[in-house]
């Protein structure tokens, strides 16, 4: 599960993933976090 700080971060993450980037790389460049929990800590959920 990915958690992003805002909609812009989510858009960057999704675009990166669509382009073939790994979850880790896309999370790093977008400011998102990859977590194992089912809910995001004070981040918008997707």
UniProtKB/Swiss-Prot annotation:
Protein's job: Thionins are small plant proteins which are toxic to animal cells. They seem to exert their toxic effect at the level of the cell membrane. Their precise function is not known.
Compartmental location: Secreted
GO MF entry, a single one: toxin activity
Alphabetical GO biological process terms: defense response
Annotated protein name in UniProt: Viscotoxin-1-PS
GO cellular component, one term: extracellular region
UniProt source species: Viscum album (European mistletoe)
Disulfide partners: 3-40, 4-32, 16-26
